Structure formats: C-alpha cells, structure tokens
From Swiss-Prot:
Gene3D superfamilies: P-loop containing nucleotide triphosphate hydrolases (3.40.50.300). This is Adenylate kinase. The gene is adk. Its EC number is 2.7.4.3. It comes from the Bacteria. InterPro entries: Adenylat/UMP-CMP_kin (IPR000850), Adenylat_kinase_CS (IPR033690), P-loop_NTPase (IPR027417). SUPFAM superfamilies: P-loop containing nucleoside triphosphate hydrolases. Consists of three domains, a large central CORE domain and two small peripheral domains, NMPbind and LID, which undergo movements during catalysis. The LID domain closes over the site of phosphoryl transfer upon ATP binding. Assembling and dissambling the active center during each catalytic cycle provides an effective means to prevent ATP hydrolysis. Its main location: cytoplasm.
Length: 191
C-alpha cells in the first residue's frame, strides 16, 4: 500500500523545495509531486484542460476540483514509489473532502500525514515577490493567493487534527533544519 504525505503551506513557505529535497535524498522509495507543477505542466500543453487551468491560475484562483483530483490521483497511481509526497494540496475544504472520499473508496493509498510548513505572511511575501516565478507573482495576486490559502486553513487543520494525521513544522528556519525534521518524520512511518 502506498503511503501518502500531503505538504501544505502558504505561497513561499518552501513546501515544494522541501519535498523535492526529501524525494531526491530518498529517490529509491519516495516520489514527489507538486500540485502546482502538475497543473503548470498541463497548462503548458495548451490542451482544452490546460487553457482552463491557465485561466484560473493567472488570476491566483483555484483550479476546478475535478481537474485537480484527477491530476493528483493519476500521479499517485502511476508512481512506482511506495511513499508519495504531494505539496500544495488540499487548498480548499472541497479539495480536502474530495480527496478524503476518494481515499476512503480504495485500498491502494493510505494518507499517513498532512504536514504544514508554517511561515509568517511577511516571510511568505518576501519570498514570493523576490522569486518572481511567473505572471502570477505580483503583489495583488500574492494577497489573493494568501487569502485563498488562509480562508479554509483552520477547517483543513481541524479536519486532519481530528484524524490524528496533522503535523506542523516551523518553516522560518534554514532549509537544512526544515528538511531534516520533515524527512525524519516521514521516514519514521516507513519502519
């Protein structure tokens, strides 16, 4: 059975980089998928679905639920690795509920933990506006992305706390410290 770890955090929290490094350090057993990367890859294909994704992401809005869930489940099931890290998901209560429903309806994948990389809004803003990855990284869109992240956060945290799978990690430290803590935590489930 595949072990799933969801890594959430504000834009600029470092969740994608953390997950990439952990997967690289454990490439035999761990696969990493960034929801953002999966959606950007689809968008770049300029397919009908890709253009729809681009319409939402260029405004800092959430991509429709069914597109996101399809993309994620397809990535998990096609992976040859036993431990799957997905960052940037869930970003809404609806995404959380849809994934929970899908996970409960099958026995190939088990959710082991939801890890939140916690940073202040100031840290997130400095990182995102200093990074300028694309057209969506300007101040107006940053604030929209923060609102989209923060609005459902308490409900998402409580849902996973009630399932005893929520873990918070301080994202205000060096990348080495964050990655070491997260990696040790993830690997503790493999034993």
């Amino acid at each position: 059975m595949k072990q799933l770890f969801l890594i959430i955090g504000a834009p600029g929290s470092g969740k994608t980089t953390d997950a990439e490094l952990i997967a690289k350090n454990n490439s035999e057993t761990i696969a990493h998928f960034s929801t953002g990367d999966l959606l950007r890859a689809e968008s770049a294909k300029k397919t009908e679905r890709g253009l729809l994704i681009e319409k939402f992401t260029s405004q800092g809005e959430l991509v429709p639920l069914e597109i996101v869930v399809e993309t994620i489940l397809s990535a998990i099931k096609s992976s040859s690795k036993g431990i799957i890290l997905i960052d940037g998901y869930p970003r809404s209560v609806e995404q959380m509920q849809a994934l929970d429903k899908e996970l409960n309806a099958q026995n190939e994948v088990v959710l082991k933990s939801v890890i939140e990389v916690k940073v202040s809004e100031n840290t997130a803003k400095e990182r995102v506006l200093g990074r300028s990855r694309g057209a969506d990284d300007n101040e107006r869109v940053f604030h929209n992305r923060m609102r989209v992240f923060l609005d459902p956060l308490a409900e998402i945290q409580n849902f996973y706390k009630n399932k005893n799978v929520y873990k918070a990690i301080n994202g205000e430290r060096s990348i080495e410290e964050i990655v070491n803590e997260m990696q040790k935590y993830i690997l503790s489930f493999a034993n």
